[in-house]
């Protein structure tokens, strides 16, 4: 009897996970000004979103304890490899700091990618503040959440949930073509 209950429950959970992964999200191509924020980089330095104006910015609101966020790293690595760092910068910000995620957990995740799958994550990583300022502003619907900002800091694109490289690349190509 118990095993009969588990099978439908597992199937339901698998279906629910697939549904949420595929259909979660909100895609908008409207231009609005991104609200500036600060974050703590892995080296302890405080950085601001506006420090990166002049380049197209891919903001990845993520968490180390989020499996879809880890899958998103593979797509962001393709972006890193295929776009000039003079044109596009990637910021992966762990927004679950208020849930206990730390610099060492984030660094361990970066190291695990290098050691376990031979992949260097060569972009800027940082942590939200304890109040969850970035999470509340940019990732209140969940993680991963991806934003693309134009060179002036306007939001060009946003998506909640895992996003494929080809979609990200097409959005980057469009915003880069606008100058």
Which role does the model predict for each range below?
Residues 26-50:
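N-terminal "domain-start" segment that seeds a small globular fold
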Residues 53, 61-78:
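Conserved redox-active cysteine motifs that mediate thiol-disulfide chemistry
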Residues 55-57, 62-65, 97, 142:
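Short pre-active-site segment immediately N-terminal to redox-active cysteine/selenocysteine motifs
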Residues 87-103, 119-130:
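Thiol-based oxidoreductase modules, predominantly thioredoxin-like and allied folds used
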Residues 107-151:
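Short, internal strand/loop/helix patches
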């Amino acid at each position: 009897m118990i095993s009969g209950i588990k099978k439908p429950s597992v199937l339901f959970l698998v279906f629910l996970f697939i549904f949420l992964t595929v259909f979660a999200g909100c895609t908008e191509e409207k231009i609005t000004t991104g609200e500036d924020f600060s974050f703590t980089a892995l080296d302890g330095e405080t950085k601001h979103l506006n420090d990166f104006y002049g380049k197209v910015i891919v903001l990845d609101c993520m968490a180390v304890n989020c499996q879809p966020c880890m899958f998103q790293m593979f797509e962001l690595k393709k972006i890193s490899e295929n776009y000039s760092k003079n044109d596009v910068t990637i910021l992966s910000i762990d927004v679950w700091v208020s849930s206990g995620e730390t610099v060492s957990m984030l660094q361990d995740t970066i190291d695990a990618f290098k050691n376990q799958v031979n992949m260097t994550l060569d972009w800027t990583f940082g942590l939200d503040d304890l109040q969850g300022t970035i999470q509340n502003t940019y990732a209140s619907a969940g993680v991963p959440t991806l934003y693309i900002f134009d060179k002036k800091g306007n939001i060009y694109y946003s998506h909640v949930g895992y996003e494929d490289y080809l979609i990200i690349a097409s959005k980057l190509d469009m915003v880069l073509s606008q100058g």
